[in-house]
Amino acid sequence: KIEDVGDKLRSAGDKISGVGQKLLPVTAAVTGLGTAAVKTTADFDTAMSQVQATMGITKDAMSDLNGESVNTVEALRALAKQMGAETAFSASECADAMNYLALAGYDTQKIYDTLPIVLNLAAAGSIDLASASDMVTDAMSALGMKTGEAGTMVDQMSKTASTTNTSVSQLGEAILTIGATAKTIKGGTAELNTALGILANNGIKGAEGGTHLRNVILALQSPTDKAAACMEKLGVETYDSEGNMRSLNDILGDLNTGMDGMTSAEKQNIIASIFNKTDLAAVNSLLANTGDTWDSLQQSITESGGAAQQM
């Protein structure tokens, strides 16, 4: 009987031991989750500390945010966590994006307003946050845009990328290459994206597309004496009666009309008289898409509200 009791005790011990072994993976998983959570919190705190250092503020610093005086650090931490919960990016990544904006000299209000735009651009274009931040801040600076306008531009870039043969990243490169020259375009960023989309459909994209479009605009704005005489003869005017640049579609459309009935050789001679020879392929691509084709694409890009979030 004593031996039977001993056998039963050993059996019970083996079962308890087996339960313990089965619980080990569960315990390890729970411990792992705890460790990951601690690391995530530590990463977030480190990222926010970097934002604080870049902005040169103390933990007690106050800022005016949407008309209210708030603790700067607490407000930015709350924003990073909110964006981390609402987007595909973690709170730490959102804090990193904040730091890129702080490096560009943005204050609390501008960071608060611009961060969602940067995150939308990064997600829509599948690009890293550093590049997205640079694109937004550089474009706002070059084109003299306000935050709301930057949000519209990102939507337009996303719409252009989804309807023409280019990407958000390539459009960003093109826009930054054109820079302040694009300020004078009548149709703003919608017309800019339309022209870049047309060029992209013809294999001219990225910085290359931006360079050619910039050259085309400059050639129309400041023509040589020979080019000016040629344009006048054809009835092509770059500026309206008030001295503002007309739309590219209208200018190039008038050039097409002026060359109507000419041979291909005659047309190319005229185009070469007005534009740089290195830009002729781009000019011909734009000329081939004036009128309704241009208007239709530009309208779809203009009506692109929320396109970045949809992508």
Explain the meaning of each model-derived region.
Residues 87:
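N-terminal glycine-rich anion-binding loops that anchor highly charged ligand groups
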Residues 4, 8-11, 149, 170, ...:
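Juxtamembrane loop-helix boundary motifs flanking transmembrane segments in multi-pass membrane proteins
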Residues 25-84, 93-104, 111-124, 131-163, ...:
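Small-residue helix-packing and pore-constriction motifs in hydrophobic alpha-helices
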Residues 2-5, 9, 65, 267, ...:
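Extended hydrophobic/Leu-rich segments
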Residues 42, 127, 166, 218, ...:
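Flexible, active-site-adjacent loop/turn segments at secondary-structure boundaries
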Residues 3-27:
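Membrane-penetrating hydrophobic segments
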Residues 81, 239, 246, 250-311:
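Hydrophobic, often aromatic-rich secondary-structure segments at membrane interfaces
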